[in-house]
Amino acid sequence: MTSPCSARLQLDENLQLMQAGSPMRKVKSRSWKKQRYFKLQEDCMTIWYNSKKTGNTKSTFSISDIETVREGHQSEVLQSIAEEFKPELCFTIVFHGRRANLDLVANTPEEAQCWIQGLEKLIETVTNMDRKDLMDQWICDWFQKADKNKDGRMNFKEVQDLLKMMNVDMSEHHAFRLFQMADKSESGTLEGEEFVLFYKALTQRDEVLKIFQDFSKDGKKLTLLEFVDFLQQGQLEEENTEEIAMDLIARYEPSDTAKKLHAMSIDGFLVYLCSPEGSIFNVAHEQLYQDMMQPLCHYFISSSHNTYLMEDQIRGQSSIEGYIRALKRGCRCVEVDTWDGPNGEPIVYHGRTFTSKILFKDVISAIDKYAFRVSDYPVILSLENHCGVEQQDAMAQHLKSILGNKLVMSTLDGRIPVRLPSPDELRGKILLKGKKIGRLEDSLEEQPDDSLGEVSDEEENIEVEEERNEDKKRAKKSKERLSQELSDCVIYCKSVPFVSFQHSRAHYILYEMSSVTEYKARKLVREPGNDFVRHNAWQLMRIYPTGLRTDSSNYNPQDMWNVGCQMTALNFQTAGVEMDLNDGLFRQNARCGYVLKPSFMRHVETTFNPDQPQGTEGYSPVNLSILVISAQQLPKVENSKEGSIVDPLVRVEIFGVPIDQTKQETKYIENNGFNPMWYETLHFKIHVPELALVRFVVEDYDKTSRNDFVGQYTLPFKSIKSGYRHIHLLSRDGTKIPPASLFVHIRVTDASQPEQDT
């Protein structure tokens, strides 16, 4: 059976050479370099490689698993063998998610180029596949897996094995009936189009057909008016529904005849429901839709802790790959932990542990290269400086020489700021967060203008003078430990110790900011009143995990977002609920790494209190009703027994202010991970919707132990689209797992209005 990918690319010379196979060295370290035989499968979608010595298949991976290919010595592993192998022989395969990169050395430059160009073409082809191509590819993939003897046809025994692989528990009688219906040639086997018929019969969506027929008079098509009715009544769209209907028909209806009639067939209807426009995530929020001209302190900023670590904090690997991955995920604040290194070169690692070490200048070079690949909004380097003055000077030189004019070395207008600059004003810029000698005013010739206001009261003058004297004492003390050159690189993010909210109001300036541990932040969250929220309306604050988290685990970031903390730093290398929430929040606004805080968190006189939101700004309760209808083609649980089939349940979790934290789940469906049906409605009341995140989780029920994770999807409540929606599930590490999805109906009503049944 020919895959759409191989059919499209079968004449490509590079791919033909890749299908013939090539011996290459797989490299893990300077001392671990082993010969492997790599080959592109006939489907043009799978690479397998084996040991040249034994001939046993060692591993396979899909082209869809690959994010990009890097040419030359672009990984630390390949840099370590640069003297042994020329760059034109080397390349790195980078995978989606947290999977380790694959570093390879070809035997000739021509062979390396063949694989680099071939892989790039395959990645581009897969990326540009439409839904029909993807469906054809999935069908082909299943056929390849089930056709054990590789004779190009499938007998009934192979079909039965396939059903188990697909998480389908079906009676032998029903399976044989579907098999016979598809076996048009009556040969006792399925091949080519016969298998396509079988797959389509297997994947028929009865629940979608029912919705279609509810709105279709003849049961065969939706006229334009019928489709408009569906958009208004089913999808709860209120504006421009006729224009939307025309656009959706033009884009998703496969039949030219139906298009000319401005009608939609059941095939087009299903394609639309599975498209981005049929997704639960509002496509308008995939664009840059927020005001980016507010001061930095008015945004939640995607922030990473111990960015250089790939694993735990005791023996884990330090790598520039940590920075590359974080920045490519939209992270805008990365941590650089510096220590004195040999040969006068500062190094980055988790100090006083067995983690490996990397050069500071290599980290800055990686940041320079990748800072603005996915977002052109500012990157903040959070500097944890343990170096002596001499190597601090070296750090300053590297920052200036490598980053050039990207590094902010003065206020934007050369004047003392009266507010923090906006993300828009700082496009393409890199800010250094760290300690600074004295005040910013000392390094600027321009003095404050009248807009800052004059201090006329005699008592205030005395207080200011005393404060200046204290500043001079502190500056003199810090000069002994801090390089002037490095200090001059700190402009808008001067690090100062946090004492109390009252102390910050009395002594600190808007360009000064504090970093506190999650433990201290939680204590501040528990303080009565809303001082924390007000503080974060005018000054930046960074929260980071406690040092006790040696396994690089994370804390719940929602608690910090509830009080407006901008930089809630997490260990990006560690998958889990906490990173799901982070990915969910920053999924919106073009994934640019900046999300505008709600208006009630952006002014210092706000009354909003997350612990007691009733009667304050931000309190606008709504009812959320979720009808969980079905799931489609759920993946097998990791490390599950052969032949086992999942018993799926769906849990919906609400994260937000304390009163909104809750979860509900459906019953489990026994032995059906392929097309389970629930038709269960879950009801929630959300009091502060602008801070709420909704997480959909699918688990494999286990009555004797903990349920196993199957997939999840997290998004801001305000980004949810009402109506019939698909939720395209993600794996534990946040990568896509097509075609796995949930199908739901969403209804949101004002909490003062009675809910309607779906």
Curated annotation (Swiss-Prot):
A motif (GBA) lies at residues 213-243. Binds 5 Ca(2+) ions per subunit. Two of the Ca(2+) ions are bound to the C2 domain. Its main location: membrane. Substrate binds at residues 433, 435, 515, 542. It is an enzyme of class 3 (hydrolase). The keyword Hydrolase applies. Residues 26-53 are annotated as: Substrate binding. Ca(2+) 4 binds at residues 645, 647, 671. Ca(2+) 3 binds at residues 306, 335, 337, 384. GO terms for cellular component: endoplasmic reticulum; nucleus; plasma membrane. Ca(2+) 5 binds at residues 700-702. Residues 602-731 form the C2 domain. It is a peripheral membrane protein. The active site is at residues 305, 350. SMART domains: C2, EFh, PH, PLCXc, PLCYc. Residues 16-124 form the PH domain. Its EC number is 3.1.4.11. A motif (PDZ-binding) lies at residues 726-729. This is 1-phosphatidylinositol 4,5-bisphosphate phosphodiesterase delta-4. It comes from Xenopus laevis. The gene is plcd4.
